């Protein structure tokens, strides 16, 4: 992995076997970025997709592997009032299943790079976005206070 800052944005090149989400969080901590958005593309080999089930307040997980074309990666990083980091990441993958081209998408728990991933990390300027737990839904939301 390597990254550089140009202007207000960080440009990250991830390499084989890098885990995308944990790497983004590590860079945010190292650079003292408390809230940011990010996007990216790449070639991956492993992904854990989560779907939130409101009735149970838990996530269902699906694991996909193989040559996964990361067609779209979007997300954000925020902290809570205690400076604990959280991510909210969604991705879309295309892959082949026999002769069929398939897609998989959703909320991401982890993504492992096969060849490379190219990520743009955009810190929030002029303020901070925090995360606040919502007991009614059992999940966290942005807090601007």
Predicted features, each with a name:
Residues 1-39, 45-87, 92-145:
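N-terminal intrinsically disordered, cationic/polar leader segments
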């Amino acid at each position: 992995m390597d990254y550089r800052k140009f202007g207000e944005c960080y440009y990250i090149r991830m390499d084989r076997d890098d885990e995308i989400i944990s790497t983004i969080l590590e860079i945010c901590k190292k650079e003292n970025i408390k809230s940011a958005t990010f996007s990216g593309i790449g070639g991956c080999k492993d992904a854990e997709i989560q779907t939130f089930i409101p009735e149970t307040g838990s996530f269902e997980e699906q694991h996909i592997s193989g040559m996964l074309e990361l067609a779209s990666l979007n997300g954000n990083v925020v902290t809570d009032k205690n400076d604990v980091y959280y991510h909210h990441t969604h991705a879309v993958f295309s892959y082949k299943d026999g002769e069929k081209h398939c897609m998989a998408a959703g909320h991401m728990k982890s993504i492992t790079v096969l060849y490379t991933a190219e990520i743009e990390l955009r810190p929030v300027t002029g303020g901070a976005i925090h995360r606040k737990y919502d007991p009614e839904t059992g999940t966290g939301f942005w807090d601007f206070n």
